[in-house]
């Protein structure tokens, strides 16, 4: 067997144990579905040469804007940009945000080449303002490129993709932050056990999730990252969410019940990812990732758009230049003790609730709209205080000191659309919870995808009034991204509707479903 034909940028001694060359030498399929299966199965992962051919083909087929820099551009500009500096001393572009170049079994020449390529990309893409994932992408592509110019061209095609439905890498601080928020939403939905652990061991769980791209682009060992990148080039950005969720699931499985290795869970997760080979193989990691029944691409795109809108409304679109990624002031705003007051829950309990709500709403402080101590027990007054606000959080304290509540995604004014009859409304983002005697969140088990469909009138059902309750809300202009969505497929029109309110009762729940 002939040894792999590594290029001059690769440390051959390290590569022999990182990625073998034992597989097939050619790929003949052209159908997307077959490519997906082969990528997930690692068909070209066993052949260093074949992987290079596949990358060349897949990147060549990326639809790009008309003027996209190619290898000839690199040859023209690299001398002017680098000058007489040695490659090792070249500064990294500002858009990588002090992200270090992963070694990925590159030799010193290869690491210097990555710096040169990044600087030339910065010269040709002035619109790319924040892209900490790019050093890892360039370092991997350099393995499978004949020279620096070819690697530059491949990276440029990834950045220049003009297919709006095919997002590849975040290129602005706004896109990066909204992706972090979207990942937090997905963790909240699909990794509840891990999320509960994160809430328990970290002061700000959102800071932990803001590190998710670093797990993939930098901390994962080369053989793992290459397998992820194989599938990423075929299937796109959603794969990154899947793998990051799988990493968090494995971290929870290994570390649950064990003391953390440091007082910083972010550092513990990074260390876990670096040594992930001790826990799971690349095959098992991808198997776990694709076993998650994730939202569709369209649904994730809607969630991403809603998170971007929330950031824009907060005026958060660019990163403060003086703050590094590891020390930057995170945009997520926790519940501040000085600005929060409730007769039912304290700041710690409200922060627990805030860790469950969609991240675009966790940007804001809760605002007290209604309290039975202040406003009495009139439902009319309750509706008057809450109308025009969404979402709201309902808190109830019983005479036995038990505390429960619900996160309600939709404006209570929706109840007026039923012509005086009682009817259910709401979206699949709603949930109920208990804080005393123990903390527990309950989801609506029927819901697989949130949607607002046509309300369905039901017969009135009365519920006894509670001794004390209050409602907190976000600004009225923060609408759920699913309010205008009509494309989700649900078995029943009423399965995402479980808010109802009339003149004599208020109902959270639905006779057709179950809270668990």
Curated annotation (Swiss-Prot):
Quote one Gene Ontology molecular function term. Answer: GTPase activator activity
Which cellular component appears as one GO term in the record? cytoplasmic vesicle membrane
Name of one Pfam family that matches = RabGAP-TBC
Alphabetically list the UniProt keywords. Cell membrane, Cell projection, Cytoplasm, Cytoplasmic vesicle, GTPase activation, Membrane, Phosphoprotein, Synapse
Record domain TLDc: where: 343-516
| Locations listed in the record | Cell membrane; Cytoplasm; Cytoplasmic vesicle membrane; Presynapse
Report how it sits in the membrane: Peripheral membrane protein
Tell me which residues make up the Rab-GAP TBC domain.
34-236
Residues annotated for a 1,2-diacyl-sn-glycero-3-phospho-(1D-myo-inositol) binding in this entry: 36, 40, 238, 242, 293-297
Q: Which residues carry this modification: Phosphoserine?
A: 473, 480
PANTHER family per record: GTPASE-ACTIVATING PROTEIN SKYWALKER, NUCLEOLAR PROTEIN 7/ESTROGEN RECEPTOR COACTIVATOR-RELATED
Subunit field text: Interacts with ARF6.
The function of this protein is: May act as a GTPase-activating protein for Rab family protein(s). Involved in neuronal projections development, probably through a negative modulation of ARF6 function. Involved in the regulation of synaptic vesicle trafficking.
What is written about domains in the entry's comments? The Rab-GAP TBC domain is essential for phosphatidylinositol binding.
Protein name as annotated: TBC1 domain family member 24
Q: Which organism is it from?
A: Bos taurus
């Amino acid at each position: 067997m002939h040894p792999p034909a590594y290029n001059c940028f690769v440390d051959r001694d390290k590569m022999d144990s990182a990625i073998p060359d034992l597989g097939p030498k050619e790929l003949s399929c052209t159908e997307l579905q077959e490519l997906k299966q082969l990528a997930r199965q690692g068909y070209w992962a066993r052949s260093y040469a074949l992987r290079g051919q596949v990358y060349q083909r897949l990147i060549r087929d990326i639809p790009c804007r008309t003027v996209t820099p190619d290898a000839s551009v690199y040859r023209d500009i690299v001398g002017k940009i680098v000058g007489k500096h040695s490659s090792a001393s070249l500064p990294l572009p500002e858009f990588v945000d002090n992200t270090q170049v992963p070694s990925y079994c590159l030799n010193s020449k290869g690491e210097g080449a990555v710096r040169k390529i990044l600087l030339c990309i910065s010269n040709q893409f002035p619109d790319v303002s924040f892209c900490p994932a790019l050093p890892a992408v360039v370092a991997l592509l350099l393995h499978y490129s004949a020279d620096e110019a070819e690697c530059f061209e491949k990276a440029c095609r990834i950045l220049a993709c003009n297919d709006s439905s095919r997002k590849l890498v975040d290129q602005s601080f706004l896109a990066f932050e909204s992706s972090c928020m979207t990942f937090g939403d997905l963790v909240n939905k699909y990794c509840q056990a891990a999320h509960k652990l994160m809430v328990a061991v970290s002061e700000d769980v959102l800071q932990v999730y803001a590190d998710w791209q670093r797990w993939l682009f930098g901390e994962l060992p080369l053989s793992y990252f290459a397998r992820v990148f194989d599938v990423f080039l075929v299937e796109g950005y959603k794969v990154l969410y899947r793998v990051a969720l799988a990493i968090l699931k494995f971290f929870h499985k290994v570390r649950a019940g064990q003391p953390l290795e440091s007082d910083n869970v972010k550092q513990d997760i990074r260390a876990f990812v670096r040594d992930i080979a001790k826990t799971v193989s690349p095959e098992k990691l991808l198997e776990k990732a694709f076993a998650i029944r994730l939202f569709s691409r369209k649904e994730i795109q809607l969630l991403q758009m809603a998170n971007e809108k929330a950031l824009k409304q907060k005026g958060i679109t660019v990163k403060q230049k003086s703050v590094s990624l590891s020390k930057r002031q995170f945009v997520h705003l926790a519940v501040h003790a000085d600005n929060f007051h409730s007769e039912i829950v304290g700041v710690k309990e409200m922060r627990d609730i805030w860790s469950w709500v969609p991240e675009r709403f966790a940007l804001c402080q809760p605002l007290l709209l209604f309290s039975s101590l202040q406003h009495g027990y009139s439902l009319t007054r309750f509706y008057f205080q809450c109308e025009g606000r969404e979402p709201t959080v309902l808190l109830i304290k019983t005479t036995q000191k038990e505390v429960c509540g619900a996160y309600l995604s939709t404006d209570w004014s929706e109840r007026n659309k039923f012509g005086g009859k009682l009817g259910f409304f709401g979206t699949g983002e709603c949930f109920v919870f208990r804080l005393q005697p123990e903390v527990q969140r309950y989801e609506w088990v029927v819901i697989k995808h949130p949607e607002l469909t046509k309300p369905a009138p039901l017969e009135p059902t009365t519920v006894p009034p509670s001794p004390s309750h209050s409602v907190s809300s976000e600004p009225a202009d923060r609408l759920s991204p699913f309010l205008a969505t009509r494309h989700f497929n649900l078995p029943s029109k009423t399965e995402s509707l479980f808010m109802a309110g009339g003149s004599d009762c208020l109902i959270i729940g639905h006779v057709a479903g179950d809270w668990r």
